[in-house]
Structure formats: structure tokens, C-alpha cells
């Protein structure tokens, strides 16, 4: 099995809001590498086995994307939307997740190990068997897991400054 590596030029045409549109594409096994990945829309794209390797991902939208086995080797994700994204074995380990919205996502068996999670939402999520080992939840507002299914989720050696786990 040869590893497929895709290089994308982020100087492509932008939409009216200044976003590079990579929506509704099959980007399986692509490797996105660079300093900053910013203002990219991955709406409804297939991102299975994709690796993001960069210092920062900012202002990106992964709404309804398929993210099975995606690896985020990023120092920081900022203002990123994963609403209704679905995937297994997504790896966010050792990243700063700053203002990330995971609402209504299904991210089973995912890894949030040693993440710093700030001002982010996990409302109505299905996070079966995901791991938050040694994660820090730091927030001006409360971290929210309202109506989320946390069956078999591991919160081991976690620090939470303020949180909401209602219903």
C-alpha cells in the first residue's frame, strides 16, 4: 500500500467571504502541511486518514465532514467548527483547542490527550470511548457538554476550571 500524499495550494480562488472552498470533496489520505491553515471550508468532505501538520488551524469549517482516523499534529486550532462532523479515532492530542465547536458531532474513540481546551463546546455530542487524559479545560465561560453521550469516555487526571454537564 502506497501512502498517498496530496499537496494543496492555499492560494486558490477564494469565495466572497475569503474562504478557500474544499467542500464536498474526497480528500482521503491527503497530508495538509504548512505554517498556518486558515479560512478553509471542508463542509461535507471526506477526510478519512488525513493528516494536518501545522502550527495553527484557524477559522476553518469542518461541518458534516467525515473525519475517520484524522490526525491533527497542530499546536493550536482556533475558531474551528466541527458541527455534525462524524468520525472514529480522531487524534487531537497535545493541541490547544481554542473556541472550537464540536456540537452535534459523533467523534467516537477519539483522543484529546494532553489538550488545552478553551471556550469550546461539546453539546449534544456522541463521544463514546474517547479519551481526555491529562486534558486541561480552561475557560472564561464554562466548557459545555450539555446533552452529550459520554459513555465510556475517560476523564483521567483532568483539570476543569468550570464546566456544564447537564442532562
Question: Predicted segment positions?
Answer:
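Tandem repeat scaffolds
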Residues: 3-167
Amino acid at each position: 500500500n502506497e501512502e498517498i500524499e496530496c499537496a494543496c495550494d492555499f492560494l486558490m480562488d477564494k469565495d466572497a467571504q475569503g474562504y478557500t472552498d474544499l467542500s464536498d470533496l474526497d480528500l482521503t489520505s491527503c497530508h495538509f502541511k504548512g505554517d498556518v491553515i486558515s479560512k478553509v471550508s471542508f463542509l461535507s468532505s471526506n477526510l478519512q486518514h488525513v493528516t494536518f501538520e501545522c502550527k495553527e488551524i484557524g477559522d476553518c469549517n469542518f461541518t458534516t465532514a467525515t473525519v475517520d482516523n484524522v490526525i491533527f499534529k497542530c499546536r493550536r486550532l482556533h475558531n474551528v467548527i466541527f458541527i455534525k462532523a462524524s468520525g472514529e479515532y480522531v487524534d487531537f492530542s497535545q493541541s490547544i483547542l481554542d473556541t472550537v465547536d464540536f456540537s452535534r458531532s459523533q467523534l467516537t474513540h477519539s483522543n484529546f490527550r494532553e489538550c488545552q481546551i478553551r471556550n469550546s463546546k461539546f453539546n449534544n455530542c456522541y463521544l463514546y470511548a474517547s479519551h481526555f487524559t491529562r486534558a486541561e479545560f480552561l475557560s472564561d465561560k464554562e466548557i459545555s457538554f450539555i446533552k452529550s453521550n459520554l459513555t465510556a469516555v475517560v476523564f483521567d487526571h483532568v483539570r476543569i476550571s468550570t464546566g456544564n454537564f447537564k442532562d
